[in-house]
C-alpha cells in the first residue's frame, strides 16, 4: 500500500488483518471502485520442492486455461473478459518487475479462471509470490524485507503498466482512406 501511495496512487485494501472476506466480497469492492485495477497477492502451497513466482490473468473467453483442456464452460463470458488485453499487460508488467527485483524462479504469466479474477470488471491479476511449502521460500516469505520488496516490485510493475498505457494512448492513429 505504502509503495503505491509513494508513487501517487490511491489505494483500497480489501483487508488489513487476517479477517476473512469471501472472494465475492473482494470482487464487489473492486467493481464498485471507479478507475481502478485489482491486484490480489497470495502465497502458494504445493510440494516442498516447488518454488517461484507466478502471475495469473483471466483466460480469454473461448480459450483453455494454462492447466486445463478447453471445456464448454470456457465459452462463458465473464466480467473480467471485458479487459483481456489490459489484464495480460498488467500481469506481464508486474511479473517482469517482480522477477527482476526478487530474483525468484520464473513460473510464468499464466491464464486461469480463478474466482478472484474472473468477476473483476477492471484490469485484474493474481500474484502468487512464492511457496510457503518450500523451506527455502517459506523462510524468505517470512521475512518482512522480502514482503516489502515484493510490494515495491508490484508497485513498480503497476507504474510500468501505466506508463505503457499512457504511451499507447498518445500514439496518433493513422487515418483510414476508404
Stretches found by the model and what they are:
Residues 1-178:
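Active-site-proximal helix/loop segments of hydrolytic enzymes
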Amino acid at each position: 500500500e505504502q509503495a503505491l501511495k509513494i508513487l501517487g496512487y490511491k489505494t483500497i485494501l480489501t483487508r488489513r488483518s487476517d479477517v476473512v472476506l469471501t472472494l465475492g466480497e473482494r470482487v464487489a469492492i473492486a467493481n464498485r471502485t471507479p478507475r481502478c485495477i485489482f491486484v490480489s497477492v497470495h502465497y502458494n502451497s504445493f510440494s516442498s520442492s516447488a518454488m517461484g513466482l507466478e502471475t495469473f490473468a483471466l483466460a480469454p473467453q473461448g480459450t483453455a486455461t494454462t492447466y486445463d483442456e478447453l471445456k464448454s464452460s470456457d465459452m462463458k463470458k465473464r466480467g473480467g473478459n471485458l479487459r483481456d488485453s489490459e489484464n495480460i499487460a498488467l500481469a506481464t508488467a508486474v511479473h517482469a518487475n517482480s522477477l527482476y527485483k526478487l530474483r525468484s524462479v520464473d513460473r510464468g504469466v499464466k491464464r486461469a479462471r480463478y474466482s478472484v479474477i474472473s468477476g473483476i470488471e477492471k484490469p485484474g491479476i493474481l500474484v502468487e509470490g512464492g511457496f510457503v511449502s518450500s523451506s527455502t521460500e517459506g523462510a524468505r516469505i517470512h521475512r518482512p524485507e522480502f514482503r516489502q520488496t515484493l510490494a515495491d516490485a508490484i508497485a513498480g510493475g503497476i507504474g510500468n503498466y501505466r506508463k505503457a498505457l499512457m504511451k499507447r494512448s498518445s500514439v496518433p492513429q493513422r487515418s483510414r482512406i476508404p
